[in-house]
């Protein structure tokens, strides 16, 4: 029975979600032992992961938005566990799940526990791990400044609305990026360093990223002269980006750069990003677009 025992770490706001309750019941009826623990405050997800691993759970489910998924994935990655992770995406953007082909319907998402997990990479920024993407420049500002109320009303379109309403505030960031065989220096409008492909409610910054290639995809949108067109390009994802695929990249910015790490803001003048190959075992659908050799 141990092989069919899992713990669901569920964001507190989703505790009364009837679709989630029904999906949990269906999975239990199919023979799984699925215990549920609910987060209340910062740090709970990490604590619950530690408790689950100490208790010998071989599967953990992260239920919530991109931030919750990142918290659980980071805790498991830092623990270097062989336990596997399944994602129950319940947020507004669900960027990683959408790019990976993970169902947004709770019962279908939980059913991925029956699919063999795949080893995937995690990204590392300084001493923090991330599952999906680090964004910098205006893209991170849009994500950070999109209100929860607006998300409730507009869903993922809230990010686009925020971007359009704030385009007059666009300011380029002067940065230098360096990695193996790669160097770029100048003013950028947006930056994506992706393990996954999209962030900020559907901005596909790294369209070719794979989660099992041991590399991070770097996308730089240089600052142009015409701001409104640049915002359109950022949200539309055309070919103006400078791109690279690297095992690590270092960023330097004399004035500091705002970074958004799977929904968590941070600021740094110097930061090293690197891929952590095969750092996590994740349940993904067969043929997931994020697998370089789909399982």
From Swiss-Prot:
Domain of life: Bacteria
Compartment annotation: Cytoplasm
GO biological process, one term: phospholipid biosynthetic process
Binding site for ATP: 39, 65-71, 92
Domain DAGKc: 1-129
UniProt cross-references to PANTHER family, sorted A to Z: LIPID KINASE YEGS, SPHINGOSINE KINASE
Role summary: Probably phosphorylates lipids; the in vivo substrate is unknown.
Alphabetical list of NCBIfam families matching this protein: lip_kinase_YegS (TIGR03702), PRK13054.1 (NF009602), YegS/Rv2252/BmrU family lipid kinase (TIGR00147)
Name of the protein described by the UniProt record: Probable lipid kinase YegS-like
Lineage: Bacteria, Pseudomonadati, Pseudomonadota, Gammaproteobacteria, Pseudomonadales
């Amino acid at each position: 029975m141990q092989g069919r025992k899992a713990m669901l770490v569920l964001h507190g706001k989703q505790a009364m979600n009837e679709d989630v309750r029904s999906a949990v019941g269906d999975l239990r009826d199919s023979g799984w032992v699925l215990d549920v623990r609910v987060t209340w405050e910062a740090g709970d997800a990490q604590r619950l992961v530690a408790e689950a691993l100490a208790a010998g759970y071989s599967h953990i489910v992260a239920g919530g938005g991109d931030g919750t998924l990142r918290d659980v994935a980071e805790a498991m990655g830092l623990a270097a566990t062989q336990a596997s992770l399944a994602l129950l995406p319940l947020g507004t953007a669900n960027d990683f799940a959408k790019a990976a082909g993970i169902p947004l319907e709770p019962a279908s998402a939980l059913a991925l526990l029956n699919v063999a997990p795949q080893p995937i990479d995690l990204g590392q920024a300084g001493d923090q791990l991330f599952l999906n993407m680090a964004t910098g420049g205006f893209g991170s500002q849009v994500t950070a400044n999109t209100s929860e109320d607006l998300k409730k009303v507009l869903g993922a379109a809230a990010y686009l609305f925020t971007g359009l309403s704030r385009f007059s505030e666009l300011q380029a960031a002067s940065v230098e990026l360096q990695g193996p065989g790669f160097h770029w220096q100048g003013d950028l409008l947006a930056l994506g360093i992706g393990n996954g492909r999209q962030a900020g409610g559907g901005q596909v910054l790294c369209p070719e990223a794979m989660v099992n290639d041991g590399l991070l995809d770097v996308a730089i949108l240089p600052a142009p002269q015409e701001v409104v067109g640049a915002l359109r390009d950022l949200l539309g994802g055309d070919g103006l980006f400078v791109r690279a695929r690297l095992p690590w990249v270092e960023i330097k910015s004399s004035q500091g750069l705002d970074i958004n790490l799977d929904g968590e803001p941070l600021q740094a003048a110097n930061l090293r990003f690197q891929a952590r190959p095969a750092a996590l075992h994740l349940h993904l659908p067969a043929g997931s677009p994020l697998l370089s050799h789909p399982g």
